[in-house]
From Swiss-Prot:
Protein name as catalogued: Large ribosomal subunit protein bL9
UniProt superkingdom: Bacteria
GO molecular function annotation: rRNA binding; structural constituent of ribosome
Family statement drawn from the similarity comment of this UniProt entry: Belongs to the bacterial ribosomal protein bL9 family.
Underlying gene: rplI
Entry-linked HAMAP family: Ribosomal_bL9 (MF_00503)
UniProt-listed GO biological process terms: translation
């Protein structure tokens, strides 16, 4: 099924691209979320009329992402979790924990934009990637510390 993308979508395409995707993905995700329209003649004409507005909005989003990238480049997030004496965590650190830590640091990041390359099950330092935009990914240092028992 051919659709016109109304925004940049990672691993799929950029604003204005006409791509082939599966019908279910189109019906259940892209169209209801306003991320795409069916590639009919009327929708193509309509898209050309609103293309300038969408490109301005996309440029603004890119500018905001670059601003966040410069602030976030040297950020170190410290997460405290229950751990054994050897440093093994009771459980693991997931995207929700990292998102909470980033919010405390002053960054509003969605969980789906956080990429953890490996499972975090021990105390120590880790590098994670945060996708701010389709073209902008920033690497953030995460420090996992054992919670101090009183």
């Amino acid at each position: 099924m051919q659709v016109i993308l109304l925004e940049n979508i990672q691993k799929l395409g950029n604003l204005g691209d006409i791509i082939n995707v599966k019908a279910g993905y189109t019906r259940n995700f892209l169209i209801p979320k306003g991320k795409a329209k069916l590639a009919t003649k009327t929708n193509l004409v309509e898209f050309e009329l609103i293309r300038a507005k969408l490109q301005i909005a996309e440029a603004k989003t890119l500018k905001n992402a670059k601003a966040i990238e410069t602030k976030m480049t040297n950020t170190i997030c410290i997460i405290q979790a229950n751990a054994s004496e050897e440093g093994k965590l009771f459980g693991s650190i997931n995207t929700t924990d990292i998102q909470t830590s980033l919010i405390k640091s002053g960054f509003k990041i969605e969980k789906r934009n956080i990429d953890i390359p490996e499972t975090i099950r021990h105390t120590g330092e880790y590098k994670i990637n945060i996708n701010l935009h389709t073209n902008i990914t920033v690497s953030v240092k995460i420090v996992i510390e054992a919670l101090q028992k009183v």
